[in-house]
Amino acid sequence: MSNKTNNFPVHIFPKVVSDYINEYTVNNSFDPNYMSSAFISLVSTLIGGNYRAEVCKEWKEPPIIWNAIVGNSGDKKSPSVGLILKPLDDLNAELHRQYQAAYDEATDDEERRLIRAKQIVVGDITYESLIQVLNNNPFVLLNVDELLTLFSDGNRLSKNIDSLLSIFNQRPISLNRKTDSEKKLIRNPSLGLIGGFQHKLLDKFIGNGRMESGFVMRFLFTLRSEVRHKLIIKDANPKIVDDYTDFIAKLLTVQQYNTEIKDIPLNVEALEVFNDWRNINREVRDELKCGEMNEYLSKIEGYIPRLAIVVEMVDRVNNNDEIKIISKYAVERAIDLTAYYVANFEHLLKGSKIILGDANKKRSCVADLMKSLTPKVRKRTVKTLYDKGHSKVTISHSLGIPASTLNDQLSSERKNKGK
């Protein structure tokens, strides 16, 4: 399966990050799409237990991101992700060293029992162990090579999908042990998730009720980039690597333990752009006949504040500034990201036998909210939105229509109206 027209919008990143991704893409054939989504996971991990995006007093979104890295065997899914997440792995190792040192210095069992094991990344894990980790840490990233291992018969996480969905929404979860009276309650659980699966295993991933439960709909899907460079093995430019390492070091200072969650509001301009997009999204969903795509567009709405706070934090750290609000710039970049991920989801739907069934069965879905609409419907929708007062910038970002194309269409309509 190919995805020739949809590459990750790397323009959302500061130059220090995009240069690093490009350096390893050109010199060692790592995948820029996989690396870019992994960077989103990295940042969300560092801020997940400390910040939330505040749309309004009643609507707050935690920066919890679930990423599915999709490709074929040999596409460098895990190496590309691992290259970006290495700073988290290094931090994880240092946290374990500190824990072990404190444990060894403890003088009795009671003192040892009170020592909390700090972790920021976990791999294959049982549900009970996950609860313990979340109890000790404000945010954890579950990083697995193969997402399907989470749903194997021997993995108890597969039997706790409802609890995982609660974690995604940062709702309280608890664990009652049958062996004793101990009860653990996690009030603000934060669990990021990143892992891969092969295209040929798509139907296994979305099967067994995981699509119907909404579990699959919480994922952002990343497909392999179609950009190809000459195959070479070459050490990366040391300056580019050092600059990126320094930037990550600044990001690492954002992650804190034992702090209250800070709610970061969208400013007036950001909220206006977000509401414009929501209205456009609703009108596009009304045009759809594909139930799965309609539901995904509904779920993706909550991802815009989540992605926006990630973008805002990266921008603030890059400018050596403190995050206080979520800007219009961040929301527009988040809209760019959701357009990318929505297009990937549609691409996957087209390859699913479970969803599409008979090859002759036609279903109407969309790519980045508009691609599958007929030209006539597309033009009518653009005109309707513009007449309702939506800005050209918002329409362009939300519908994936180039600004030049949008301007040409509206200019043509004005000329025709004047005749």
Predicted regions and their residues:
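Phosphate-handling catalytic cores of nucleic-acid transaction enzymes
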Residues: 1-376, 380-383, 388-398, 402-407, ...
